């Protein structure tokens, strides 16, 4: 079975030899057909610590490196897409403010 290869944006590089990659996907709703966006964060192994916040990277499935790390960074696709990171941070900030007030996201 081939290994999964995903493309996403580095949203955190604060850990040693690890980056957090946000992968967004789109798919049509099974009944209504509306295109839905979903995102997921993956921890990826970066042994040389060369990928920075905002980089668009490809990650590939690998052996388990730690409890949550199951991917490693394959290559850099595009450098410094800070607009995508800012959009993610604003969305996260809005979600946190709603959860503090007791509202639903």
UniProtKB/Swiss-Prot annotation:
Disulfide bonds: none
Keyword Membrane: no
Deletion consequences: Increased generation time and a temperature-sensitive phenotype.
A biological process from GO: translation
GO molecular function, one term: structural constituent of ribosome
One Gene Ontology term, aspect cellular component: cytosolic small ribosomal subunit
Keyword terms of this UniProt record: Ribonucleoprotein, Ribosomal protein, RNA-binding, rRNA-binding
Entry-linked Gene3D superfamilies: Nucleic acid-binding proteins (2.40.50.140)
Self-association state and partner proteins as the record states: Part of the 30S ribosomal subunit. Contacts protein S12.
Function according to Swiss-Prot or TrEMBL: One of the primary rRNA binding proteins, it binds directly to 16S rRNA where it helps nucleate assembly of the platform and body of the 30S subunit by bringing together and stabilizing interactions between several different RNA helices. The combined cluster of proteins S8, S12 and S17 appears to hold together the shoulder and platform of the 30S subunit.
Family label: Belongs to the universal ribosomal protein uS17 family.
Protein name: Small ribosomal subunit protein uS17
């Amino acid at each position: 079975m081939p290994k999964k290869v995903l493309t996403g944006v580095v949203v955190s590089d604060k850990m040693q030899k690890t980056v957090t990659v946000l992968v967004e996907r789109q798919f049509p709703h099974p009944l209504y057909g509306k295109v839905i966006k979903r995102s997921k964060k993956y921890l990826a192994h970066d042994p040389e610590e060369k990928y920075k916040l905002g980089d668009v990277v490809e990650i590939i499935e690998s052996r388990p490196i730690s409890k949550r790390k199951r991917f490693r960074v394959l290559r850099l696709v595009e450098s410094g897409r800070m607009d995508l990171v800012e959009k993610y941070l604003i969305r996260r900030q809005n979600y946190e403010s709603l959860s503090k007030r007791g509202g639903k996201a």
